[in-house]
Amino acid sequence: MTSTAYKLQAEGIHKSYGSNHVLKGVTLTAKAGDVISLIGSSGSGKSTLLRCINLLEKPQQGRIVVAGEELQLKPGRNGELEPVNPKQLQMMRTKLAMVFQHFNLWAHKTVLQNIIEAPVHVLGISKDEAVERARKYLKLVGLEN
């Protein structure tokens, strides 16, 4: 199967914290429509892998391809890989959806404010556009009020 058949390819991902090697050459591929569950004991690297794929954590080695476009990475400090072009990383993140086991909602914010937090602060979408999108999706699931 060619690399363009996959929507996501994470190849040879390595991540260590000091002498603790959490990810040792992990490879994951996903085609359009795939739903993937990572199952393992606490501390086995599930969340670390997801955070490395979207560079919330920086792997020491590996290759990441989203929708046929390879994320351009370069060696950074402490031997971690960093994006060559932050705009490419931002665009890549708009194409990925991940749900972590433990997610945080801010009790002092409304549902709408919680929903627009990531699009505005992680993806760089304008607040107005994020609100418009959020209201559309809230309406789709019957939560517009």
Task: Enumerate the language-model features and the residues they cover.
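ABC-family P-loop ATPase nucleotide-binding domain
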Residues: 1-14
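The feature captures the beta-strand-to-loop junction immediately N-terminal to the Walker
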Residues: 39-41
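Helix-to-loop junction immediately C-terminal to a conserved catalytic motif
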Residues: 54
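ATP-binding/catalytic-site motifs of ATP-hydrolyzing domains
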Residues: 63-65, 69
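Conserved ABC ATPase "signature" region
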Residues: 69-83, 116, 127-145
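Short coil-to-helix segment of the ABC ATPase nucleotide-binding domain corresponding to the Q-loop/switch region
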Residues: 108-117
